[in-house]
Amino acid sequence: MNQKKAVILLSGGLDSATVVAMAKADGYACYTMSFDYGQRHRAELQAAERVARQLGVIEHKVIGLDLNGMGGSALTDESIAVPESPSEGIPVTYVPARNTVFLSLALGWAEVLDARDIFIGVNAVDYSGYPDCRPEFVEAFERMANLATKAGVEGNGFRIQAPLQYLSKAQIIQAGVARGVDYGLTVSCYQADEQGRACGKCDSCRLRADGFAAAGISDPTPYF
């Protein structure tokens, strides 16, 4: 019997690393995809490669995209500062249509691989309020995927799996530790330095630190 395959979006951060471990524990042959899209630092891409090796994925791809030219986000436009305190509404670290673009490319690879499952580490509990992390988005993308692909119209539909959707950050960390994730390999900070050290001030750093504290697990994050 052939092992079921999954394409997994792997940013190099805590959430996506956990998703890879979950998929592997569920018996999937894991194919991971990361994006060099003009983000502020490459440390997360290096982290993604480390995580892919540690968790033993079948293949890890890094896709080049230039989102700098569009701007519109503190993660792709150096002229927009990364906020270091909570704000109302959708934060400036939101990258326009990022998850839509990333999932579309993962969908293409999944169709080539004859993989029926695509995993993404979005979360609607301890998150920054991005519209493309909501359950409604995941459900809508799955419907689109099955309308827009050869596999979908031939009855071999895709599933967009978001296993972290309703978990707290502490629950995510506990799930990853139980499945052997080395969180010391991951980078979550929006403005990490070249060594992957975190600022400890941005929204992503706060969510990560609070999650480790709530989980009762030592935080391996290095700070500059």
UniProtKB/Swiss-Prot annotation:
Gene coding for it: queC
Gene3D superfamilies in alphabetical order: HUPs
One Pfam family, short name: QueC
Biological process terms in GO annotation: queuosine biosynthetic process
Protein name according to UniProt: 7-cyano-7-deazaguanine synthase
GO molecular function, one term: ligase activity, forming carbon-nitrogen bonds
Assigned protein family: Belongs to the QueC family.
Its EC number(s): 6.3.4.20
Cofactor binding note: Binds 1 zinc ion per subunit.
Organism in which the protein naturally occurs: Pseudomonas aeruginosa (strain ATCC 15692 / DSM 22644 / CIP 104116 / JCM 14847 / LMG 12228 / 1C / PRS 101 / PAO1)
Pathway: Purine metabolism; 7-cyano-7-deazaguanine biosynthesis
The keyword Zinc is annotated on this UniProt entry: yes
Positions with a binding annotation for Zn(2+): 189, 199, 202, 205
Job description of the protein: Catalyzes the ATP-dependent conversion of 7-carboxy-7-deazaguanine (CDG) to 7-cyano-7-deazaguanine (preQ(0)).
Binding site for ATP: 10-20
Reactions catalysed according to its record: 7-carboxy-7-deazaguanine + NH4(+) + ATP = 7-cyano-7-deazaguanine + ADP + phosphate + H2O + H(+)
InterPro entries tied to this protein: QueC, Rossmann-like_a/b/a_fold
Cofactor(s) this protein requires: Zn(2+)
Keywords: ATP-binding, Ligase, Metal-binding, Nucleotide-binding, Queuosine biosynthesis, Zinc
Entry keyword annotation includes DNA damage: no
Enzyme class, first EC level, given as a word: ligase
Residues forming coiled coils: none
